[in-house]
């Protein structure tokens, strides 16, 4: 009995690990350079985007940026008018699902919107909700754009064991 299955193209490689580490580090440095208060969100977004298959990286990146904007906006509005009310939080997640359906965002976009919403609403902050939302959107967008730049410039090499199978 197998505990898991895998596809050859989804296996990590040494070059992928280097690219991901490089991209995440660059995104944190850029975030700090431009004064983003929690630049680690840029690194998290970079790591997530770096795991996407090459053919879907750009469309998913655009979707993630749109979804982050939605989650940040609805999160800021919820925080201003209702605080961290769990019932309203659940309604906001439902609303994001409906908006995602209308905009034809895939589940990955919907999950990004919900994660951003949760970060804005559930983490107590000193700054106003709109400032927190703007920071999260900027940090996540920076991470996504950094990943896209690294993927475009640093192509991943072929794996050493091309004929490996999951049998």
What is each of the regions a protein language model found here?
Residues 1-167:
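Alpha-helical transmembrane segments and their membrane-interface boundaries
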């Amino acid at each position: 009995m197998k505990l898991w299955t895998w596809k050859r193209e989804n296996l990590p490689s040494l070059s992928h690990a280097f690219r991901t580490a490089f991209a995440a580090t660059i995104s944190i440095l850029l975030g700090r350079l431009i004064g983003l208060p929690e630049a680690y969100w840029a690194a998290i977004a970079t790591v997530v985007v770096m795991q996407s298959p090459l053919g879907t990286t750009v469309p998913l990146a655009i979707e993630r940026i749109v979804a982050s904007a939605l989650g940040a906006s609805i999160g800021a509005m919820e925080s201003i008018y209702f605080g961290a009310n769990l019932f309203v939080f659940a309604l906001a997640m439902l609303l994001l699902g409906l908006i995602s359906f209308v905009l034809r965002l895939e589940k990955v976009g919907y999950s990004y919107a919900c994660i951003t919403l949760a970060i804005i609403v559930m983490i107590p902050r000193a700054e106003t909700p709109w400032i927190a939302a703007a920071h999260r959107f900027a940090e996540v967008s920076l991470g996504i754009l950094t990943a896209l730049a690294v993927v475009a410039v640093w192509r991943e090499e072929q794996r050493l064991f091309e004929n490996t199978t999951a049998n």
